[in-house]
Every structure is written in structure tokens, then in C-alpha cells.
Amino acid sequence: GHHDIAYGLSLGGKILSRILERNEIVIKHSILDAAPLLPLPRWLVTPLKYYQCANVWTCYHWTGFWRWVFHSHYFDVILDECKKAYPFGGSKAVLDGYTSVYTTKLESISGSDIHYWYGTKEAFVARPQVSHLTSLHPETKVEVFKGMNHGQLLIDKPEEVAQRIMRMQYE
């Protein structure tokens, strides 16, 4: 298959990186937004995967709470997806998924135009990812967003993300 543009934030970026690693689909422009590309220290894997599982569980069971906390269409979409997906895999699927995310290392990557985005507030985590990615693909274009934290650009400025993606399409 062939795609013009693919964007993945965090876990979505990890999934996109795995697609690029396998080189099964040609993607003209790829954006990895704060994607975890390196394994975490072993001691951190279990607490983080249970933390993420709790997040997904609360998205499924306490949807109204999250809609109240985050007044954003983006969160409505995420919450709706959790409501659809969680009943089919439950906690085990979430735990298995995050175990894979947190323990695998990107070994290779293919693509003609790869971008890595992250915010300055997550730089301590993102810099090693960028270093690893640029060692595999030196032409990677890295963009750092001042004052932004993990996922904040998409949540707070979805129109800016859309505009950047549209510009890429016509480059």
C-alpha cells in the first residue's frame, strides 16, 4: 500500500514507527509525535503499564469525568475509542500493548520524509529518542515546540497540527 501522510502521537507514533520499521507500507511523509522508540528501564515498565491501564480504564468507566476535565473534541474522540475498544480486550490487552511499547527498541526505519515532534517540557525523555532515530535515519526533521508537554500541541492547537500536515502534503 501507499499513503501520502501518517501522523502518530505517543503510542500512535510507536505504532507508526513499527510500520516504518517493517517497510510494509510506503508512506511519503511520516510524523512521529513524541513516539517512544527505545525501551524503558525494566524497573519502570510495570508501574507505567499499570498507570496507563488505569488511564484507559477510567476513560471507559468515567467518561463524563474526563469530558468535564478536558473540554476538547480530541478527548471526545479518544474517550469514544476507549469505550469501543476496552470491552473487547480489557485490562489484559492494554497491559500487553504497553508492555510491548515499553520494552521494544526501534531497530531500523524506512521512509523518505520522517519528522519527529516533541515539546520542550518533555525534552528529557524525547532527546534520547531523537538521538536514536537520527542515528537510524539522519535525514529526520526534528521540530521542538516551545512550552509544550506530551501531546499538548495536538490537544491545545489541533488546527496548527492540521495546517502543518496540509503544508507537508503540498511540499
Regions found by a protein language model. Name each.
Residues 1-4:
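Conserved acidic catalytic loop of the alpha/beta-hydrolase fold
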Residues 7-16:
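Gly/Ala-rich beta-loop-alpha elbow adjacent to hydrolase catalytic centers
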Residues 21-57:
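Flexible "cap/lid" loop of the alpha/beta hydrolase fold
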Residues 58-108:
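Conserved alpha/beta-hydrolase catalytic His-Asp/Glu region
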Residues 110, 116-118:
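Short beta-strand/loop motif that positions the catalytic acidic residue
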Residues 118-148:
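Conserved loop-alpha-helix segment in the C-terminal half of the alpha/beta-hydrolase fold
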Residues 148-159:
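Catalytic histidine-centered segment of alpha/beta-hydrolase-like enzymes
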